């Protein structure tokens, strides 16, 4: 609904209206308490990057979400250019899909997201670690094939493993 309203709000022929950077890139900031739209239990964010030629797989992911009754208030689909040289860099040439997934009222949500994660790996994509809260650690090396390079940097910067996080423990990044 939000996506449709946002699309229809744009004037068809208006060319002389300037928006601030914040208005353009953060439209939800204009919606009072937008984060409460999913209720007390809230939502989780799931974001993947897929290679440019994986449009059929992108459609498959969207269809699985729709078939499961996953009605997301906000979805973002963007085309990525080339990624950068960081060993855990998320962007890659292709597509990124981000969705807000309600955490209640969807039976089988964990299994659905696990299957989506597996499909992402099958086509050479990855999940966005900054938004991930549930990915299986076994998938990480396939999504981030330069993980060993990152571990070398980690070992040099923190040989005593003093720096860690819940995510690092869950994904077995701490080593």
Language-model regions, residue ranges each:
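Noncatalytic alpha-helical scaffold of FAD-dependent oxidoreductases
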Residues: 1-175
């Amino acid at each position: 609904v939000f996506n449709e309203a946002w699309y229809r709000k744009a004037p068809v022929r208006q060319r002389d209206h300037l928006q601030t950077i914040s208005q353009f890139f953060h439209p939800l900031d204009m919606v009072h308490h937008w984060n409460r739209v999913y209720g007390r239990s809230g939502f989780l964010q799931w974001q993947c990057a897929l290679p440019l030629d994986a449009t059929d797989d992108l459609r498959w992911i969207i269809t699985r979400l729709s078939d499961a009754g996953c009605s997301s208030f906000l979805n973002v689909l963007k085309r990525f250019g080339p990624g950068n040289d960081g060993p855990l860099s998320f962007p890659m040439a292709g597509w990124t899909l981000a969705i807000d997934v309600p955490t209640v009222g969807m039976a089988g949500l964990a299994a659905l997201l696990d299957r989506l994660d597996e499909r992402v790996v099958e086509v050479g994509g990855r999940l966005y670690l900054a938004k991930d809260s549930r990915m299986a650690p076994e998938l990480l090396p396939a999504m981030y094939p330069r993980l060993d390079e990152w571990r070398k940097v980690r070992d040099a910067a923190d040989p005593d493993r003093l720096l860690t996080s819940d995510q690092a423990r869950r994904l077995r990044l701490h080593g």
